[in-house]
Amino acid sequence: MRVLIDTNVLLDFLLERELFFQDAERLFQAIDSGQIVGYVTATTLTDIFYIARRHTRSIEQARQAVSETLTAMEICPVNRAVLEVAFSSGLADYEDAIQVACAVDQGLDAILTRDSQGFLNSSVPVLSVQECWHRLEEPNNSKST
C-alpha cells in the first residue's frame, strides 16, 4: 500500500507524542518492513524542521527529524503544476490541498492523517492509521504495495 503520511502523523512519531506515538511507531515499522511505502510532500520537510526545532529548541534534533524522514520516506515533488491543481481544488486549507494534489499526482492509495476534516473533499481516500491497519488486514490486501 502506497500512502501519503500527513505531517501530524509523522510528527507523532518523530516527537514521540504520547497519545499517538504507538500507532505512529507501528506505521514506521510497517514502512521499514516494506508492507507500506510512505510518502511525504517536499513541503512537509520544512514544516517538520520548523516544528521540531520549536518543540525541542534544538537545531540538531530538527535536522535529525528531517534526516529520519528522508531515510524512511519517498518524497512527492511539489512543482508548479501540483501547486496550481491544489489552488484550484476548492479545499479550504492550501497545505492540505497540496498534499491531496501530490497524492493524486503520485497515484497513491490513501492519505494517512489524524485530521480527516482537513481533507473532506479529497479525491484520494483519507484514513487514520488504525483504518489503514484494517485495510491491510483484509484478506485480499495481505501485502499489496
Where do the protein language model's features map onto the residues?
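A general alpha-helix detector
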Residues: V9, D47-I51, V85
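Active-site-proximal, substrate-binding regions of enzyme catalytic domains
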Residues: E25, D47-E74
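Active-site neighborhoods of divalent-metal-dependent phosphate/nucleic-acid chemistry enzymes
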Residues: E74-S116, K143-T145
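Short, structured coil segments at secondary-structure junctions
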Residues: T71, G107, S122-S123
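Short, conserved alpha-helical segments within structured domains
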Residues: V40-T44, V82
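Short, well-structured N-terminal submotif of metal-dependent ribonuclease cores
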Residues: M1-V40, R54-E60, N121, L127-T145
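Positions that flank functional sites
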Residues: T46, V85, G118-F119, H134
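Residue-level "edge-of-site" marker
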Residues: T44, A65, S116, C132
